[in-house]
Amino acid sequence: PFTYGFTTDGDLVEPDNAEMLALAKNFGTQTLLHLSTLTEQGNFSAQRAEAMLNDPQIQSRLIEQTVRVMQEKGFSGVDVDFEYLGRDLAESYAAFLTELAQAVHKAGGILMAAVAPKTSDDQPGTLYEGHDYAAIGRAADQVLLMTYEWGYTYGPPMAVAPVNAVRRVVEYAVGRIAPEKLLLGFPNYAYDWTLPYEAGLTRAVVIVNETTP
């Protein structure tokens, strides 16, 4: 309900968030425009990211529309969450964040970027390879470490955010990004598994703390 997506032509896809923004304003809460590669089906699309990142005109259109909506709706800045980009898009993604940050700053906002929970520069996997911690840290004002989802719906029973795993991510991150820029992601949910767990069959039920403000 809160994510802004975009088309392959670089046009911003806006959610129906008027009620949520009004509520935030009533409570004096600052808001960020959340920009992601999520599709209408709820999946992250590397194809949409690639089309935008490799075309300067499409990229400029998306940046212009994002900043305009940020100003029109009173957002304090932009929060970017592009996932599963792969190694080939890492450099162009960081360059996009740099361009977006310049436009956002000119309009008086801040830029935040979410990054996958890496523990090394060369960590394999499309989720990790598209995020260059050092380059993203230089571009963004704040960087959110997505330190959660080790335990997930179709995986084996385990903590969503194991302390030892989170610690390894933080130790790596502070060596690549200025510590004062870092934010630690903390899950407001858990999973309930049916036991015994059967790989490929067991599906955990998500438990959400809906009373948390």
What positions do the PLM features span?
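Append "and occasionally in soluble cytosolic enzymes with long acidic Gly/Pro-rich linkers
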Residues: L32, V67-Q71, E210-P213
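Substrate-binding surface in catalytic domains of secreted glycosidases
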Residues: T8-A18, A90-T212
